[in-house]
């Protein structure tokens, strides 16, 4: 069935109020969009921030008469008589199929492919990780994940012990195992990430080599030959002593989740423990690598 979509240009202060009112008016779905392509980086714990310029998008049944709803919105003092909005009809589609069509196998480096389960594997002789998009965790499409995957592909991981610090979907942990790592330890603060990592490891037949922990449960004597941490600049700085402690002498380190302008400061900080390399960049993001002193 077709739908009617109402788009309202507003700001972060009023978006939630408008959303509540539209739900009362019969909207079956509300989403928020960025009005001016403004990124949000490193929100505080527990925050779900909105963009300063936010578009509220409401979906209604096609039979809905929006005239009373728009009249009601015009009476709101923070919108006013001439508030910016757009009404359009949306034809029904197989939304699941359309969503799936957006994801294709992606190659990282020379050996590694990340493939959705519904796609044919392009190169059966390559190192193939089967991973479906889900939750808010990495699937290889974000530049920081891509930078880490390319780095892992460049290493000889045969018989190496690896730590994936902030494992999320487990994409880096699973990739390391498929690339030959002896074992991987994944650590994350989110129990959903632990579950997602375990499920993806099982799908790729490497679950027997993957140990997963919440931070408070990780072994005190844990050490690895290779450690990759794709988190954010704040946690990378805060956790630096612990991360350094986890890497064996002459072990390898990769840090990502960093904006370009944050890379030098983090590199300088980690140079207490590591011989740091020049940063690698992709779009606005950076990856740092180093060798444990």
From Swiss-Prot:
Catalytic activity: L-lysyl-[protein] + 3 S-adenosyl-L-methionine = N(6),N(6),N(6)-trimethyl-L-lysyl-[protein] + 3 S-adenosyl-L-homocysteine + 3 H(+)
KW Cytoplasm (keyword) present: yes
Residues annotated as binding S-adenosyl-L-methionine: 145, 166, 188, 230
Protein EC: 2.1.1.-
Classification via SUPFAM superfamilies: S-adenosyl-L-methionine-dependent methyltransferases (SSF53335)
Record-level GO cellular component terms: cytosol
Location(s) in or outside the cell: Cytoplasm
Keywords for this protein: Cytoplasm, Methyltransferase, S-adenosyl-L-methionine, Transferase
Gene3D superfamilies per the UniProt record, alphabetical: Vaccinia Virus protein VP39
GO term, biological process aspect, one: methylation
Superkingdom classification of source: Bacteria
One GO molecular-function entry: protein-lysine N-methyltransferase activity
Main location: cytoplasm
Family: Belongs to the methyltransferase superfamily. PrmA family.
Function: Methylates ribosomal protein L11.
Protein name per Swiss-Prot or TrEMBL: Ribosomal protein L11 methyltransferase
Gene source species: Shewanella baltica (strain OS195)
Gene transcribed to yield this protein: prmA
């Amino acid at each position: 069935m077709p739908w009617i979509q109402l788009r309202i240009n507003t700001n972060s202060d009023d978006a939630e109020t408008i959303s509540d009112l539209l739900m009362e008016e019969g909207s079956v779905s509300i989403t928020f969009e960025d009005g001016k392509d403004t990124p949000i980086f490193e929100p505080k714990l527990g925050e779900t921030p909105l963009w300063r310029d936010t578009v509220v998008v409401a979906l209604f049944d096609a039979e809905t008469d929006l005239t009373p709803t728009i009249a009601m919105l015009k009476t709101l003092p923070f919108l006013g008589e001439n508030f910016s909005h757009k009404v359009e009809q949306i034809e029904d589609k197989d939304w699941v199929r359309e969503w799936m069509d957006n994801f294709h196998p992606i190659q990282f480096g020379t050996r590694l492919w990340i493939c959705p389960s519904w796609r044919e594997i392009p190169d059966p002789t390559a190192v193939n990780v089967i991973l479906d998009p889900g939750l808010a965790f990495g699937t290889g499409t974000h530049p920081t994940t891509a930078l880490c995957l390319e780095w892992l592909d460049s290493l000889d991981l045969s018989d190496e012990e690896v730590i994936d610090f902030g494992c999320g979907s487990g994409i880096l942990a699973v990739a390391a195992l498929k690339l030959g790592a002896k074992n991987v330890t994944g650590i994350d603060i989110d129990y959903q990430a632990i579950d997602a990592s375990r499920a993806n490891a099982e799908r790729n037949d490497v679950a027997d080599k993957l140990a997963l922990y919440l931070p408070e449960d990780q072994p005190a004597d844990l050490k690895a030959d290779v450690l990759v941490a794709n988190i954010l600049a704040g946690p990378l700085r805060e956790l630096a002593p612990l991360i350094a402690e986890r890497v064996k002498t002459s072990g390898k380190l990769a840090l990502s989740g960093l904006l370009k302008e944050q890379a030098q400061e983090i590199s300088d900080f980690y140079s207490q423990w590591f011989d740091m390399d020049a940063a690698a960049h992709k779009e606005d993001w950076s990856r740092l690598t180093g060798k444990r002193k």
